[in-house]
């Protein structure tokens, strides 16, 4: 008999109720691990002077580690304590305490309002700037984020890397402050700041004491229209950017893999270009190119200003009008539709790079919103990604890594939101005795099994439970909520659609998951990249 114990209290985990409770705890534990990892890995999708959301991941990690410590304690006792049948009953006092805590958690999961954006208001200023204010009075801090709807996908051949280069130059002074003074002023106010560039947008943020918010808003508004771009600063910074490219891409295997993958998976859409830019384009970039990018895209009517934290909405609105509304609107170019041609056959690329192990990456063309209108398919693919690789006992982990032992690591990556077409990516490292051909065959076989047999109600319920838990964790982080607002708005979606998306995911059926596994996972839309390791030259 296996008992969950604390001091002198015992709870029988071999009883029917005990097994159910332990099963739910296990799901919860695995779900938190997966979602924490997924959330914190999001920073890898962005290019910037530093990676984003360290504070968010740190807070999330601390909270989840506390929960895992409690569950791990139970787990160890579950595995190690053996008792006689005479101990088959449990202490009623402990049961009451444990059950009470569990009921509270269940209540939160079941009845906590799905709306993440209570106390949130949206405004449009006279110059077209969209302002969103999120009041959250749990801590005496505030966050300001400015998102520009311009990323590397808005660049053209020969000018790649401009969005990221301007991100660097935004810290090099304005007509009112000297180079480096922006960061120095934020630090002097006791705050932290950074920026990041993606294929779809560029964003800047500061996190400061609520009492310093007005000063920080004035600083950010200043560089929206008074940036001082000069040749001397640019000539130094472009060398920094080129070195960053060498460090993160040219001399890093994973960087080479995904740069090569995107360059081949897309033939016409600008997603094929790296965010940091091709080295030849960086070598030929001029300060005039950066100035033109700034003049074209950095306008209040092409930006979203998000303020959150221990703030007063009316006060923030007044400050926004004072510092931002005076900035003139611009004629922002209308982005023309850029459709990726239909892929009509498998594409195979072999990359040779310095590495210890071979790698295999499968990338299937997939819908993303709002670029695609296939909303239900995108939702079902999000669920499928979790079924394959969304928790410790997901199919790839359980069957290919632990059971068949043909891979040491498998990851899936699919984001169903983006301004351009999506990719459903499966990346794997084979074991020493497994060929890449066999690994590819087995990965495809797992997806084919789902397309033919579907998934179980247990799998689907587990994933949906994780989605609800993820929403709860997200609401505990002010920075995380503001990040999500910015992401949705920069993609052309209203921030309130976060809850709509969650509800849609909760309504995905087993048949929908089976259907997308059959529809999207075929060789006609597949790009395969294999990595052949080469030894490091001494």
Give the role of each language-model region.
Residues 76-103:
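Bacterial N-terminal signal peptides that target proteins for export
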Residues 124, 183-332, 350, 360, ...:
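Charge-rich, well-structured scaffold segments of protease-associated domains
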Residues 263, 332-393:
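His/Glu-based metal-binding/catalytic segments typifying zinc-dependent metallopeptidases
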């Amino acid at each position: 008999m296996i008992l969950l114990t604390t001091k002198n209290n015992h709870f029988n985990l071999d009883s029917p109720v005990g097994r159910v409770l332990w099963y739910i705890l296990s799901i919860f534990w695995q779900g938190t691990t997966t979602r924490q990892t997924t959330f914190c890995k999001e920073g890898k999708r962005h290019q910037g002077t530093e990676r984003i959301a360290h504070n968010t991941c740190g807070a999330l990690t601390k909270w989840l580690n506390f929960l895992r410590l409690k569950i791990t304690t139970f787990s160890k006792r579950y595995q190690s304590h053996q008792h006689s049948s005479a101990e088959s009953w449990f202490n009623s006092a402990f049961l009451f305490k444990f059950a009470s805590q569990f009921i509270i958690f269940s209540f939160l999961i079941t009845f906590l309002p799905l709306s993440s954006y209570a106390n949130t208001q949206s405004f449009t200023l006279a110059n077209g700037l969209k302002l969103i204010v999120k009041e959250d009075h749990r801590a005496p801090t505030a966050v300001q984020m400015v998102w520009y709807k311009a990323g590397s996908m808005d660049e053209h051949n020969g000018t790649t890397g401009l969005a990221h280069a301007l991100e660097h130059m935004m810290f090099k002074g304005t007509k009112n402050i000297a180079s480096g003074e922006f960061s120095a002023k934020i630090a002097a106010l006791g705050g932290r700041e950074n920026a990041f560039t993606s294929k779809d947008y560029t964003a800047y943020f500061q996190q400061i004491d609520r009492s310093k918010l007005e000063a920080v808003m004035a600083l950010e508004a200043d560089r929206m229209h008074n940036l001082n771009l000069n040749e001397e600063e640019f000539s130094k910074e472009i060398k920094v950017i080129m070195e960053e490219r060498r460090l993160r891409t040219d001399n890093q295997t994973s960087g080479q893999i995904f740069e090569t993958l995107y360059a081949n998976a897309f033939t016409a859409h600008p997603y094929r270009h790296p965010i940091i830019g091709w080295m030849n384009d960086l070598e030929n970039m001029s300060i005039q190119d950066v100035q033109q990018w700034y003049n074209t895209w950095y306008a209040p009517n092409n930006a979203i200003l998000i303020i959150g934290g221990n703030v007063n909405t009316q006060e923030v609105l007044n400050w926004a009008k004072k510092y931002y509304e005076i900035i003139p609107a611009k004629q922002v170019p209308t982005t023309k539709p850029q459709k990726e041609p239909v892929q009509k056959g498998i594409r195979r690329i072999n990359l040779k790079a310095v590495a210890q192990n071979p790698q295999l990456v499968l990338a299937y063309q997939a819908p993303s919103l709002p670029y695609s209108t296939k909303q239900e398919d995108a939702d079902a693919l999000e669920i499928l990604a979790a079924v394959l690789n969304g928790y410790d006992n997901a199919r790839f982990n359980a069957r290919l890594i632990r059971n068949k032992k043909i891979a040491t690591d498998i990851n899936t990556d699919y984001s169903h939101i983006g301004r351009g077409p999506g990719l459903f990516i499966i990346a794997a490292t084979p074991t020493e005795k497994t060929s890449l051909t066999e690994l590819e065959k087995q990965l495809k076989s797992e997806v084919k099994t789902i397309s033919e047999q579907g998934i179980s109600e247990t799998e689907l319920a587990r994933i949906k439970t994780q989605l609800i838990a993820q929403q709860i964790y997200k609401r505990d982080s002010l920075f995380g909520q503001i990040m999500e607002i910015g992401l949705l708005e920069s993609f052309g979606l209203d921030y309130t659609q976060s809850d709509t998306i969650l509800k849609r995911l909760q309504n995905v059926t087993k048949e929908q998951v089976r259907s997308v596994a059959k529809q999207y996972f075929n060789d006609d839309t597949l790009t395969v990249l294999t990595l052949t390791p080469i030894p490091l030259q001494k």
